Amino acid sequence: MNNRGGFSHPPGKFHMRGSKTYTPRNGGQGQGQPQQAAPAFDQQQQQQQQQQQQQQQQQQNFDQQQQQPQQPQQQQGGNNYYFQSKFGNKSHRGGYHGNGNGNNNGNNNNNNTSPNLNSTSHNNNNNNNNNNNNNNNNNNNTHFTNSRGGHRGGSSRGGSSRGGNSGSSRGGSRGGYRGQSSFYNSSYQKSGPRLLTSIVSLPPFSGGAIIGVKGSLWGLLNKATTARLKVFKNTAIIKCADAQQLDRAKEIVLKLKNTSPKYLSLIDYKGEQKIKFVHQPSFSEVILESGAIDPLATDGVQLMQDLINSHESQYVARLNETFSTLYSEKGSSTPFIDIEAGKIWYLHSSNIPSTPMTADKYELYTESLASVFQPSNVINEQFITSSQYKLFKQKKQFTFISVLDTESLDLLCIKCSEEKITPTTTTTTNTQQSPNSDSSEYKFTDPFIYKLNHINSSKVLFPQIKSGSDLRVTIDTHSKSKLVSGTGQHQYDNLIKFIDSIKIHKNSSGNNTYQIPDSNLFMTESIITRKVLMYRSDDNSLQFHVNEDIATRYTTSTPEVNRESTTVFCTSPALYDLFKSKNWTVDQASDELKKLSKNLRLLVSKHLDSTKFQPPSADHTTQFEQDDEEEEN
């Protein structure tokens, strides 16, 4: 009885015309091996054949009429045979090929081996099938040594062949055996190295990622690692097949994440790949002398403190709780306070800060400091004028160029001065590249290399009343040490030569053109409105640098817009001495902290509402030129 469609076949197997299940190669036995089958296997065959013999003969003619014209040689015996597949599962084989059973042992003498069975009559088919049934009953013990072929894809070469008369070893007159391509190919067609993924969160900055320009960061990672990078607004996704390269790429992104984006570009100077952040090349510093301003001298400051003490009980409680955490280490370490970022560092040495305080206290402290700047809407602002502070030092213009070494991953800072090139030596250059008559050519000179030991970046909102807008300040906390010549500076000779090769063309309108030879400069664009730098200096004071920076775009084709910026130093020797004495109370630290906060608040307000800052005159530049060698460490 034909069992077509009556049984489910194991997945992954190829079934000819959807009705047959094929055995493995040689039926699971090797060619030439003794024809021994399992006893249970033979008994099952014998019992099934005896029970179904009469039924086969009665329904033979009926089943023959139900066959498809393409398969006239198909056996109608309906014997149910089982074999052990190569996957360890029993598979049903109902109605195998009678004419194509491939027996070459001489017992099946009546098998038709002609490929032209399609033209035979039904009587011949019936006679052939009857003979095949009888022969199959006599050859039960030897049937499963046959190949999968048969006459459909069969071969007269024996049981080891899967090929056919069509000339293909795996073919057949009807397509024959297709192997197991549908099973194995689907399993391995998508194989390949698995990419490891690392996700780094990025704080938003100026409408974009704090990393800076996406193309520049991609170019850096592409040259330094084998990782792939995708930068979103607040997230950077790094993918790499190698775990070591992934860690290196993540370390680079984390270092850039904690760096304020001055100007970001990937440059190739003399064959070395570096990343550079360029500060504004023109700004001056105004240092507030200690004691020049008494925070308690004005009614506005006194009103500020009265409001804090009387109406902001929640602020006082949180601030006291924060300072109480300093007791555990005040006997062995000096607290380093970034007042604007709301972080407290413990300086075990002058250059290496310890781990900052926990995140929950950081949030409390940040919220508390915000109330210092704006506890109420009725505060009268007190703006600093020139009569309220003493200017005792003024430095000439210089440029900071911060560099990330992609080999050692060290952050370096290069301080350069701008020197005007005399027209007699650059007449040809100015004529060709700077047609404007009011243009002057400058270059960077006297570079000094500093190693940045710690960099931290954060943002603080200064609420403004008089100006009608808020001031967003980016705060960088870092310490740096100068690399003395002879102690490793020689490895940065190429960097120094590259800085010296940069030429700057300036005009009266403020549009500057930078010529950078022998480099691959990516398009860069970064916007910084304000930033505050705070670090511990050697003169025992905590210094706050309030810089006013304007956006600059660095490209190799278009002119660059560069404007002046301002820096203000606000020091607090009293707070530093208080911590250094290791004999302080929470109230004392809180009072000094409020004073310093108010001083910084007034300084920022002054610069917002003042007129455009005027650069120092030539007399001042000459007078204090010798002070440039005393750069803070």
Curated annotation (Swiss-Prot):
Q: Which intervals carry biased composition (Low complexity)?
A: 32-80, 104-148
Query: Does the keyword field hold Cell membrane?
Result: no
Keyword check for Coiled coil: yes
Signal peptide from the UniProt entry: none
Question: A single GO CC term, please?
Answer: phagocytic vesicle
Disulfide-bonded cysteine pairs: these are: none
Q: Which domain of life is it from?
A: Eukaryota
InterPro entries noted in UniProt: Integrator_complex_assoc
Q: What is this protein called?
A: Putative uncharacterized protein DDB_G0284097
